[in-house]
């Protein structure tokens, strides 16, 4: 049995084949995502940035790349919402603003950055630390005092002033970069990247791409500790992992919303470094051995035996080959189980042909931390983690979406999922093991903190996602803040609106048919599509996923301005009915009515 380590690098990534990277077979080049990405490609700036608590961001790498467009700048309200959402305990964010020569903001986004390096592994049932505890998860949590992350912004003529602010509001630092200067400073960087990727192979994971990276969650598998002769094994491992990852809810219901890619970067040696480790749990397996790998994978990070990490700066630079990434999973070929979650999350995989439930559960548990901001629900009073409270008015003190110190029904963040017949607090398991209530014992404390589910994946990684967990993953997918695009996945496919112009001019009495194509899981329930004129709803219809909705607007009196908006609502039952409108997306047209003489004018693009 080949045991292999999977380094789930949730620091976000993607890939596009360049001249130095071996091309996949012709058939794989024709997958839907690659076709759409090439069709809508546009130039972008790609930076790797380092920052620390109280230390201003510094650019350590720059490259101009091609990305799937169009880029959509976040509005001020959405920026504020995402920034507030990133002040929680799991992470904070970098606020990114690109300005033109007049100082006007022409593009802005939020980048989510983890605050913690986690080691959460599943102990054997007979392990001494498993006895007398409500979980087999063995947790070690370390604060990240420095962060490395990627910034991607579109190339816009006349806009070279990039401002990056980092950290929680009370400690936020900022720096401004001249992108033209960075381009000159890093001239030749592409040659350096190409040399580091000599012999690399990039391809889509067969059967796991569905559309443009501009409107999907793009997961990149990055090979570490695989030699040039190990490409076959890397394919087997990642094929199986993608299949297993997408086989459980909520992912299985939203398979069309994810793309999987892989980049095999050959290493000279197999596995990862195993330094001598002071951890008393160290089993001294091949300790003191070192191997030459592409991303410097090593065990015993921070003195914790199974804490496996890679050089995130090197990984992010390599990922510039496909800059559409949202999540990186670095697969480390090793016989020793280990892992971490943070800027780069790591977990082990027993066998590339099967992927054990233990490994799958830990990977999805870490994904839930980083992608959906979910908190741990198990008790471990040795965990060194910041306290939280939903009783305070300061949002930076609030707890994660699935845990709380609120003990009464009306104050529960997940009260919409709690049946009126369920007592709060809840003391016994419910007949439906995934149903919501309020059980005491959560977020490492056995009293004073409450969890939303009796026993789900955030309490025991062998358990499924509960209803609140599932919804939070989908809410995060739709609201964004985790990659590119920063605004999340849309229920309206980008690039399908007609007319494509955001601003139109019509003559009095003229008509125009407005339309766009919907996007939701298929098979699945129809979407509810609402049309608004100046914020007054004028039509509601039921539209099958992937179908187009249209509305014909007739221009009234000359000299007036009208706003027409299409709103598409995902009706999947994994989203509570009260949540669905909150994550719906819209397409908007502004129409000016002239006094005549303009048969049909389009302004903008």
Q: Language model features by range: what are they?
A:
Residues 171-203, 576-602:
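Short beta-strand elements
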Residues 19-22:
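Boundary at the C-terminal end of the N-terminal hydrophobic targeting segment
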Residues 7-16:
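Bacterial N-terminal signal peptides
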Residues 149-151, 547-551:
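Short strand-edge motifs at loop-to-beta-strand transitions and within beta-strands
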Residues 24-198:
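Extracellular glycoprotein-like low-complexity segments
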Residues 200-216, 222-227, 239, 243-383:
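Active-site-proximal segment of zinc-dependent metalloprotease catalytic domains
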Residues 158-160, 558-564:
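Exposed beta-strand face motif in extracellular beta-rich ectodomains
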């Amino acid at each position: 049995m080949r045991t292999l380590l999977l380094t789930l690098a949730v620091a976000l990534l993607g890939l596009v084949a360049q001249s130095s990277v071996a091309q996949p077979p012709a058939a794989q080049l024709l997958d839907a995502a690659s076709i759409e990405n090439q069709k809508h490609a546009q130039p972008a700036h790609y930076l790797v940035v380092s920052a620390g608590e109280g230390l201003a961001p510094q650019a350590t790498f720059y490259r101009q790349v091609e990305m799937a467009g169009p880029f959509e700048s976040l509005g001020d309200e959405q920026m504020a919402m995402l920034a507030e959402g990133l002040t929680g305990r799991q992470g904070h964010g970098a606020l990114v603003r690109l300005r033109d020569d007049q100082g006007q903001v022409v593009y802005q986004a939020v980048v989510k950055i983890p605050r913690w390096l986690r080691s959460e592994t599943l102990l054997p049932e007979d392990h001494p630390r498993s006895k007398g505890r409500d979980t087999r998860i063995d947790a070690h949590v370390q604060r990240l005092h420095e962060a490395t992350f990627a910034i991607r912004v579109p190339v816009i003529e006349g806009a070279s002033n990039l401002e990056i602010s980092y950290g929680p509001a009370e400690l936020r630092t900022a720096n401004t970069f001249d992108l033209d200067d960075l381009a000159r400073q890093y001239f030749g960087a592409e040659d350096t990247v190409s040399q580091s990727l000599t012999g690399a192979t990039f391809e889509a994971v067969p059967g796991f791409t569905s559309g443009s990276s501009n409107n999907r969650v793009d997961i990149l598998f990055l090979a570490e500790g695989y030699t040039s002769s190990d490409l076959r094994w890397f394919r087997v491992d990642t094929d199986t992992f993608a299949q297993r990852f997408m086989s459980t809810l909520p992912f299985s219901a939203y398979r069309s919303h994810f793309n999987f890619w892989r980049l095999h970067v050959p290493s000279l040696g197999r596995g990862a470094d195993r330094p001598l480790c002071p951890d008393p749990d160290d089993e001294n397996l091949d300790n003191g051995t070192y191997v030459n790998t592409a991303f410097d994978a090593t065990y015993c990070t921070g003195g914790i035996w199974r804490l496996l990490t890679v050089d995130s700066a090197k990984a992010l630079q390599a990922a510039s080959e496909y800059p559409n990434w949202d999540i990186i999973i670095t697969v480390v070929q090793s016989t020793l189980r280990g892992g971490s979650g943070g800027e780069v999350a790591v977990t082990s995989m027993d066998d590339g042909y099967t992927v054990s439930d233990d490994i799958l559960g830990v990977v999805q548990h870490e994904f839930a931390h980083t992608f959906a901001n979910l908190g741990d629900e198990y008790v471990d009073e040795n965990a060194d983690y910041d306290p939280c409270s939903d009783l305070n008015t300061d949002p930076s003190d609030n707890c994660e979406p699935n845990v709380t110190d609120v003990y009464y029904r009306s104050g529960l963040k997940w009260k919409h999922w709690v049946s009126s017949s369920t007592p709060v607090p809840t003391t016994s398991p419910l007949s439906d093991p995934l149903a919501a209530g309020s059980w005491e014992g959560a977020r490492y404390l056995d009293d004073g903190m409450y969890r939303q589910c009796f026993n789900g994946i955030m309490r025991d990684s062998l358990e499924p996602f509960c209803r609140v967990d599932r919804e939070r993953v989908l809410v995060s997918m739709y609201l964004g803040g985790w990659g590119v695009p920063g605004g999340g996945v849309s229920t309206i496919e980008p690039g399908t609106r007609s007319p494509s112009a955001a601003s139109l001019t019509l003559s009095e009495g003229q008509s125009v048919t407005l339309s766009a194509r919907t996007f939701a899981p298929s098979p699945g329930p129809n979407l509810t599509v609402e049309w608004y004129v100046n914020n007054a709803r004028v039509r509601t219809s039921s539209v099958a996923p992937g179908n187009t909705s249209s509305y014909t607007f007739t221009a009234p009196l000359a000299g007036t301005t009208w706003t027409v908006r299409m709103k598409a609502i995902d009706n999947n039952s994994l989203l509570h009915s009260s949540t669905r409108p909150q994550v719906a997306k819209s397409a908007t047209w502004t129409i000016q009515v002239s006094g005549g003489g303009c048969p049909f004018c389009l302004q903008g693009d």
